[in-house]
Amino acid sequence: MHMFEIHREEIEWAGRKLVLETGKIARQADGAIFATYGETTVLATVVSAKSVKPGVDFFPLTVNYQEKAFAAGRIPGGYFKREGRPSERETLVSRLIDRPIRPLFPEGYRNETQVIVTVLAHDLENDPDILSMVASSAALTLSGVPFMGPVGAARVAYVNGQYKINPTLDEVKDTALDLVVAGTSDAVLMVESEAKELSEDVMLGAVMAGHSSFQPVIDAIIRLAEKAAKEPRDLILPDKTEVEVAVLAIAENDLREAYKITSKQDRYAAVDAVKAKVFGDLLPAEGEAKFPKDLVAEVFHDLQAKVVRWNILDNGIRIDGRDVKTVRPILAEVGILPRAHGSALFTRGETQALVVATLGTGEDEQLIDNLEGTYRERFLLHYNFPPYSVGEAGRMGSPGRREIGHGKLAWRAIHPMLPTPAEFPYTIRVVSEITESNGSSSMATVCGSSLALMDAGVPLKRPTAGIAMGLILEGERYAVLSDILGDEDHLGDMDFKVAGTEEGITSLQMDIKITGINEEIMRVALGQAKEGRLHILGEMAKAITGARAELGEFAPRIETLRIPTEKIREVIGTGGKVIREICEKTGAKINIEDDGTVKVASSDGNSIKAAINWIKSIATDPEVGHIYDGTVVKVVDFGAFVNFFGSKDGLVHISQLAKGRVAKTSDVVKEGDKVKVKLLGFDDRGKVRLSMRLVDQETGEDLEGKEPPQAEAGE
């Protein structure tokens, strides 16, 4: 007897085997796929409620991507030794899975739906994120849930002028492009990328190369669905025709007038008044409602979108009165906070970001622990979106998925422009506080971050700016919108964010909600985005054009020196005793790397100098003939022991204390005296021989050869 009815599809994809299997694991889920690529394995499951919860007027879709430590043969750290709250990476991959599948559910589908993807094995070569996107799409396609997929996904790298599909984790480290693209058989739905100043044509080529590369994956999912898919659920959507006619009659003219108001708050008030009028007429407080409330609300929202779209396509005029290419007025300011290492205020229309850069040392690096292992991150960018930025009162707390996603988008835009650790050995943290928002706060963060970093003296390769674009498509007509408002973001068919320098693109993010947007439209859109980006860079240059020559007054200074690797142990000392003493006595922070690189940091230059001299005294040997400052540590009958060069002790014989005959050591020096000594050499037991007589104790001048030789006693 066979317990399982297993169906599988296997294809060769970008040089590795992709296996999609269903029927053995998680059989009570609506859809479940056990997927393997190389030796990376994920389980994707889909469950969608059979009915809609009362009062739900949106599509409650949640995507949870989770990495299990056992997948890489590891035990989680921390006290509890088990997986805890989602990491930043898990949150970002959850968003990556969510974005291309969300637009493919029918409008009006309100059943709570949950996609859970669990990484079960990781071969440390094939990133599980692409496999998770493919497996989620396959699970949805098999589930019977109304889903207009399947979706494919691929990662594209750009190496030596060639596109490489699904590079390994090692290959991604050295590429000029790391781009993820997802879509259906005939449309691109999502792009997420980081690039090293690539042209619009190279970026678009990567998108199209990725799209064509995952077509065999979509075909495999369709073949699997033909064998194993569940019966499609009946989806009965209400007929909106009557409601649309009624709402249009009441609201069209008033909505058109409301959307001519350029101020966001006033416009919202006018739209709310129109909505209240519609609800008052169609859903009277007394008597019977003419239509269901949620249906009226949905149709009213649709009409809002149509009014804005009609106005743009018919007249070329947008909500705030701009034409399609105009960027809102920009004001860039730097150095606005007195004690910050670097700060900027970037205002574009009704969107504003206060961005602050802080410099730290190696010990401030973030330790990141994921399936690939543990690594240290020296560039941190945190994006905060407080509710007051949109004139609302709301929850404050730890960052949500959106804030993490927007922060990472800005991080990708700035990261390729950072100096190397050798050029600039600082840990860098940028915090963006969105103080006003009406569209494209993530791109305001990119601009503000670039300004704040330059204000802090970080030598960026070039200033970076970002712009959010929108697109409206009706049949053959389309309009590309530069610098979109918040309202235009969710009323359009495509929104995409492009960040980069005057030389090229560093980050591209696209979300496309409909089919029919082809390569040519994307090319026009990217060209218009470049115009906007260059305009914004010009406005930013009015505030600052490059990194300041000096670091901020309150930023730590870091100086670097190299010591022999065999001396590292001596500088650190038993249990860290020596390095701890240096830090405590000098006030400097010290970081020693395995190759002997030592970074000494402090906001006080004298503190750095003292620490470096101390380290040098331990790590380098004193040279014969050199003159050193020293301290008398012990007085004996035959001379004085002097501590010099930090931690070295040597003997000044009584005959080398001063000119002429010295009867008693204590006649010349006593313990604690500061003296100048010349290193004469070493005796046959390796002990250090010093002279005070050959050094002018006032000036430190070398007196050797300027006086007759004098024999040491006992010679």
From Swiss-Prot:
Q: What class of enzyme is it?
A: transferase
Q: Determine the domain of life of the protein's source.
A: Bacteria
What GO MF terms are annotated? 3'-5'-RNA exonuclease activity; magnesium ion binding; polyribonucleotide nucleotidyltransferase activity; RNA binding
Which annotated residues bind Mg(2+)? 489, 495
Q: Can you cite a GO biological process for this protein? A: RNA processing
Q: Which Cys pairs does UniProt list as disulfide-bonded?
A: none
Q: Which UniProt keywords apply?
A: Cytoplasm, Magnesium, Metal-binding, Nucleotidyltransferase, RNA-binding, Transferase
Q: Which residues form the KH domain?
A: 556-615
Cofactor dependency:
Mg(2+)
The cellular component terms of Gene Ontology attached to this UniProt record, alphabetical and capped at eight, are:
cytosol
Location of this chain's protein in the cell:
Cytoplasm
Q: Which SUPFAM superfamilies match?
A: Eukaryotic type KH-domain (KH-domain type I), Nucleic acid-binding proteins, Ribonuclease PH domain 2-like, Ribosomal protein S5 domain 2-like
Q: Which Gene3D superfamilies match?
A: GHMP Kinase, N-terminal domain, K Homology domain, type 1, Nucleic acid-binding proteins
Residue ranges that the Swiss-Prot or TrEMBL entry lists as coiled coil: none
Domain S1 motif per the UniProt entry, residue ranges: 625-693
- Catalytic activity of the protein: RNA(n+1) + phosphate = RNA(n) + a ribonucleoside 5'-diphosphate
Q: What is its EC number?
A: 2.7.7.8
Name the protein family: Belongs to the polyribonucleotide nucleotidyltransferase family.
The protein's role, per its UniProt record: Involved in mRNA degradation. Catalyzes the phosphorolysis of single-stranded polyribonucleotides processively in the 3'- to 5'-direction.
NCBIfam families recorded for this chain? Answer: polynuc_phos, PRK11824.1
- What is this protein identified as? Polyribonucleotide nucleotidyltransferase
